[in-house]
C-alpha cells in the first residue's frame, strides 16, 4: 500500500471514529488500534509437553520484539490441525509455524495454507509427502537429531564406564518411535554411539513406543524388561525426556534401584521435576536443546518472511548439550528457562 493511500485510510478511519464518538465504540474503532498488526500462528502437537510451552515462550518473545500478534494453538490430531488452519485463515493470519501431530499431513497442511495465502514453517517434526520424502520446499528448523542422539549414547557409555559396569551384566533399552524421522535419527544416533564406544550390539534392545507420552514409553520398556532376565544394570534412552522417563519408571517397577540404571533424555525441558527430586533416580541427565530459541527463531523467520519477503533458510539445525542434576540449574538459568 502506498503512503498516500495509507494516509487516506487512516483519515477515513479517524472520521468514522469521530462520527461514532458519542455512541458505543464501533467495531471499526476497536480494530483500529490493531490495524496493520501482522497475525501469525504457532501450532504444536503436544501443548501439554513443557518443550512446546518453552517454544511458545520463545515465540512470544519474538512477537513482543517485532510487534506481531501470536496465535498459539494445540493441535493433538489431524482434524484439529486442519480446523486450526481454517480458523487462522478466518482470523486473517499471514502464516504459521507448525509441529504437526502427524508428519504425513504435510501435503494437506501445505495445500490449505496455500489456498489461504499463508506461509508455513515446520518446527521439530519435518513434513513429509505422500511418497514418504521430506517436503523440502517447506522451511524447517529442528534438532541436529543424529548428533544429539550420539551425544546421548556417548553419555550412557561414559557414565557406565565411570560406574565400572561390565558389559556382560548390562543391557540397553532404547525406546523408539521410528515412524517419526527426527525420533528415528536420534535413536539411531544413540545406538551408533553405544556401538562406537564398544558396547555389544547384541545387548542393545529397541522398545517401540505406540504413543509418545510417559504411558507409551512405560509400556514399551515394561514389555522389554519382562523378556530380558538376568540383566543387572540398564542403560535407558529414547527420542526425548518423556521416552526416557517412562522407561526409567518401568525399571523401578521391575525392581531396579537407581544406582543400577542410567537414563539419558533429550529436550532437557521435560525432566526438571525429575532432576529436582531430593534423591537421585535412574534418570541421569538429558541432552538439552533450546526450545525457547527454536520458538523465537521460527517465529522471527516467519515474521521477516511475511513482512520483508525474506525467505527463510530451508533447513536449520540446533545443537544440544548435556545437563545433569549437578549442572542443569546453572545451564538453564543462563538460558533464561529457570
Ligand atoms: C519432537 C518431540 C519433542 C521434541 C521435539 C524437538 O517433536 O516429540 O518432544 O523433542 O521433537
Model-derived regions, located:
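Hinge/cleft segment of the Venus flytrap/periplasmic-binding protein
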Residues: 22-23, 36, 174-177, 182, ...
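Short, low-complexity disordered leader/linker segments with a strong preference
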Residues: 1-39, 111-118
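Hydrophobic alpha-helical segments within soluble ligand-binding/sensing domains
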Residues: 81, 140-169, 217-218, 267-272, ...
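Extracytoplasmic "Venus flytrap"
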Residues: 37-62, 66, 71-87, 91, ...
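Short, solvent-exposed amphipathic alpha-helices that sit
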Residues: 51-66, 148-152, 181-200, 216, ...
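Structural motif
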Residues: 70-94, 207-228, 244-246, 271
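Periplasmic-binding protein-like
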Residues: 41-43, 92-101, 119-123, 173-174, ...
Amino acid at each position: 500500500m502506498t503512503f498516500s493511500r495509507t494516509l487516506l485510510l487512516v483519515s477515513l478511519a479517524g472520521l468514522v471514529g469521530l462520527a461514532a464518538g458519542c455512541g458505543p465504540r464501533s467495531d471499526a474503532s476497536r480494530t483500529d488500534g490493531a490495524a496493520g498488526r501482522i497475525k501469525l500462528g504457532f501450532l504444536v502437537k503436544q501443548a501439554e509437553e513443557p518443550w512446546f510451552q518453552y517454544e511458545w515462550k520463545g515465540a512470544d518473545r519474538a512477537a513482543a520484539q517485532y510487534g506481531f500478534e501470536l496465535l498459539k494453538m494445540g493441535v493433538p490430531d489431524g482434524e484439529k490441525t486442519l480446523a486450526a488452519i481454517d480458523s487462522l485463515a478466518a482470523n486473517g493470519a499471514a502464516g504459521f509455524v507448525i509441529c504437526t501431530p502427524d508428519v504425513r499431513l504435510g501435503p494437506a497442511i501445505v495445500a490449505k495454507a496455500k489456498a489461504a495465502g499463508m506461509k508455513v514453517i515446520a518446527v521439530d517434526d519435518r513434513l513429509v509427502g505422500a511418497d514418504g520424502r521430506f517436503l523440502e520446499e517447506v522451511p524447517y528448523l529442528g534438532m541436529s537429531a543424529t548428533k544429539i542422539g550420539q551425544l546421548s549414547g556417548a553419555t550412557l557409555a561414559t557414565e557406565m564406564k565411570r560406574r565400572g559396569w561390565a558389559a556382560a551384566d548390562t543391557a540397553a533399552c532404547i525406546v523408539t518411535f521410528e515412524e517419526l524421522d527426527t525420533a528415528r535419527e536420534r535413536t539411531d544416533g544413540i545406538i551408533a554411539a553405544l556401538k562406537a564406544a564398544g558396547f555389544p550390539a547384541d545387548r542393545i534392545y529397541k522398545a517401540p513406543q505406540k504413543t509418545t507420552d510417559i504411558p507409551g514409553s512405560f509400556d514399551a520398556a515394561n514389555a522389554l524388561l519382562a523378556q530380558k532376565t538376568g540383566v543387572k544394570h540398564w542403560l535407558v534412552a529414547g527420542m526425548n525426556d518423556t521416552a526416557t522417563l517412562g522407561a526409567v519408571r518401568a525399571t523401578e517397577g521391575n525392581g531396579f534401584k537407581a544406582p543400577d540404571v542410567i537414563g539419558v533424555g533429550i529436550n532437557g525441558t521435560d525432566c526438571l521435576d525429575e532432576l529436582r527430586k531430593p534423591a537421585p533416580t535412574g534418570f541421569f541427565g538429558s541432552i538439552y536443546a533450546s526450545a525457547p530459541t527454536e520458538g523465537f527463531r521460527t517465529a522471527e523467520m516467519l515474521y521477516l518472511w511475511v513482512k520483508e519477503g525474506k525467505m527463510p533458510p530451508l533447513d536449520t539445525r540446533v545443537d544440544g548439550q548435556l545437563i545433569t542434576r549437578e549442572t542443569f540449574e546453572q545451564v538453564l538459568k543462563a538460558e533464561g528457562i529457570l
